[in-house]
Amino acid sequence: MSIVTKALNLVPMVVEQTSRGERAYDIYSRLLKERLIFLVGPIDDHMANVIVAQLLFLEADNPEKDISIYINSPGGVVTAGMAIYDTMQYIKPDVSTICVGQAASMGALLLASGAAGKRYALPNSRVMIHQPLGGFQGQATDIDIHAREILTLRSRLNEILAKHTGQSLETIARDTERDNFKSAVDAQAYGLVDHVLERRPEESIQPS
């Protein structure tokens, strides 16, 4: 049995009573009904497609109601992360982001790109920013092409972080030169999140 299959078998099921009897959901599908999306694990093309589809579905369902993305990710493929980022900016609903565990690399960029005033981190979560990583083998000309592409991506990622954090491009470039880890409080001070949540506000808990 593959690791993926084992992981899928561990997803809890939720059973609800309806007028037509019982209906079972996996926990993530049930939470999607509450407009909660989970971005968990490495960011790749498959994950990006799933997250983008969920965002577009929830926009179609109600374009006026906020969407929340819970992030616990070490980062991943830049282009996959940018697909999620562009969709978050494109759709009409505000997208709130919440860091649980860690938001590193592209995960940190997506955390910072939530709607202004609606970016959160839990108190013991960690955030890490750095420059994009890349490796390529081949002819010298091809290596040069890919090196220039990485520099282009780095410049664009720095622009996005500067836009959402309020830091200058020079500060972002300096601070992403190497892996730069931040606590939830430090991430708030830097502008990566707006609030550190100790407890959920009582008024935000709605009965199902």
Swiss-Prot record:
Its EC number is 3.4.21.92. PROSITE patterns: CLP_PROTEASE_HIS, CLP_PROTEASE_SER. Pfam families: CLP_protease. Keywords: Cytoplasm, Hydrolase, Protease, Serine protease. It is found in: Cytoplasm. GO terms for molecular function: ATP-dependent peptidase activity; ATPase binding; serine-type endopeptidase activity. The active site is at 105 (nucleophile), 130. GO terms for biological process: protein quality control for misfolded or incompletely synthesized proteins. Its main location: cytoplasm. Gene3D superfamilies: 2-enoyl-CoA Hydratase, Chain A, domain 1. It catalyses: Hydrolysis of proteins to small peptides in the presence of ATP and magnesium. alpha-casein is the usual test substrate. In the absence of ATP, only oligopeptides shorter than five residues are hydrolyzed (such as succinyl-Leu-Tyr-|-NHMec, and Leu-Tyr-Leu-|-Tyr-Trp, in which cleavage of the -Tyr-|-Leu- and -Tyr-|-Trp bonds also occurs). GO terms for cellular component: cytoplasm; endopeptidase Clp complex. Transmembrane segments: none annotated. Coiled coil: none annotated. Belongs to the peptidase S14 family. Fourteen ClpP subunits assemble into 2 heptameric rings which stack back to back to give a disk-like structure with a central cavity, resembling the structure of eukaryotic proteasomes. NCBIfam families: clpP, PRK00277.1, PRK12553.1. Cleaves peptides in various proteins in a process that requires ATP hydrolysis. Has a chymotrypsin-like activity. Plays a major role in the degradation of misfolded proteins. HAMAP family: ClpP. This is ATP-dependent Clp protease proteolytic subunit. It comes from Xanthomonas campestris pv. campestris (strain ATCC 33913 / DSM 3586 / NCPPB 528 / LMG 568 / P 25). The lineage of its organism: Bacteria, Pseudomonadati, Pseudomonadota, Gammaproteobacteria, Lysobacterales.
